[in-house]
Amino acid sequence: MPLTIGFLFNHDALHQVRHSAPVIVELVAYRHVDIVVLTSSPAQEQEVRRLIGDAASRVRFEALDAGVTAKMLDRILGLVAPFRRIAVLRSNLPSFAALDVLVVPESTSMMLRDRFGLDQLRFVRIQHGPGHRSVIFRPVIARFDLLLLSGETVRDRMIALGLTTPERSALVGYPKFDTVDPAAPGPPLFGNGRPTVVYNPHFEPRLSSWFDMGLAVLDWFAGQDRFNLIFAPHVMLFQRHIHASVEHWRMRWRAALPKRYQGLPHMLLDTGSQRSTDMTYMRAADIYLGDISSQIYEWIARPRPAIFLNPSHVQWQDNADFAHWRLGEVIDAVDALPAALDRALSAREAFRAQQEEAFRKTFSVTQEPASRRAARAIVEHFGGDEP
């Protein structure tokens, strides 16, 4: 009897798709596996189809709808919480009940078991970012039947915290890297020969640099003539005006981006296009400027200078949640940015050794593609034939 595996894409943006869609391409090779791709928006389906190519003809796509009432309520409730995503789960229980296994790049879907009673459905979680912040190690992670992990650092910490076991986890690498070579330099996005900085603030309301420093950072770059700037925040930052953190009990208002930066030839502003998710900007820049985004680990596939903004004056030095801040210089104020950029240019290799070691521990890399390793881990864990 075939093993029916569902891949769910249920988010407001497209940044999670590349983390699990490549696995579909490898799973269709298994004779007794049926694949169902469940999407909650036409944009999600279009992106999955684009990424998996010819494999799309060998899977079944199912569009999930949240219902009219939920869509109306989401206009208000969705400003501060993932209301629509939860409504999609609740409104499509028969579709999920028909599956044997559900593969997801997030943890909201565990509500299908914990709140909506689908006790027989088994869950697989693929990391949608390789970072080490505390949010990755929440208790809900222990509810997954199988965790597909990018590398030894996150695996060892999850096992130490009792969130998984060697039997319920597998090191598979990073399927997103099967869609793009992270170490290959991208084409230059400016023609003026200046070094390019990518500013990549997160949306988390307590730790993001955007809410307290962001406009000052943009103003500084707007008024100088030494650097180009790519402003490429986490794609969720500009999806909502209100950002709330249950973990830190903090809520912040995200103001609109001022028009004064538009048209400046040395500044590129992108609040959420496909290029924000396909590593276009990470591959094209010379210096990374950010805070807590896990994209820093994609950045160090090719070691380069990094600067981290710490507006909350976090005591980070001995905190595992901020391990990535050891990969560059940390500054607490925008006034310190010019000197930090000078040091980044004059000592480009200063953090190379730390970055190379972090990459090795964060990503398990073998001759076999990560997506193939992930597909095999799923089939071996839940039962199935050889391809």
What are these language model-derived features?
Residues 23-27, 210-229:
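Short hydrophobic signal-anchor/transmembrane segments that target glycosyltransferases
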Residues 143-212, 235-239, 353-354:
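A nucleotide-sugar donor-handling region in carbohydrate enzymes
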Residues 294-362:
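Catalytic binding pocket for nucleotide-activated donors in carbohydrate/polymer assembly enzymes
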Residues 367-387:
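C-terminal alpha-helical cap of glycosyltransferases
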Residues 246-294:
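Donor nucleotide-activated moiety binding/catalytic core segment of transferases
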